[in-house]
Amino acid sequence: MLDIRIKRVYDPTDPQDGLRVLVDRLWPRGFTREKLGTDMWLKEITPKNELRNWYHHNLARRKEYTQRYFAKLDSNPVAVQLLIKYAQKGRVTLLYATRDIEHNHASDLREYLLSKFGKVDREVSSP
């Protein structure tokens, strides 16, 4: 069973976060590696700039954006398998910087991983 959570980079770190993986294409402004408390940065698993720019948080494009992002993930099995490997060993927290806590690529990535590789408790972020 996979335990994958999501959390904004601005939320406090917690020992219960497990492995903290930054899943943003750009490093968050104003953060050092120590301040962010990340264990890994997987920018290759994030949506490409072209897709991000096309979507630009236009919710009317959300469904197509998600389909295109999932297709990109299907074509990147190495990065996906790396996350799965770690999630099989313990909790993984996907870190993202966007302000939108409901519609973001980290929640899409979590949904993709769980739909392909296993279900977990529906809680999205750490308490």
What residues fall within each predicted segment?
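Residues lining hydrophobic/aromatic ligand-binding pockets adjacent to catalytic sites
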Residues: 1-127
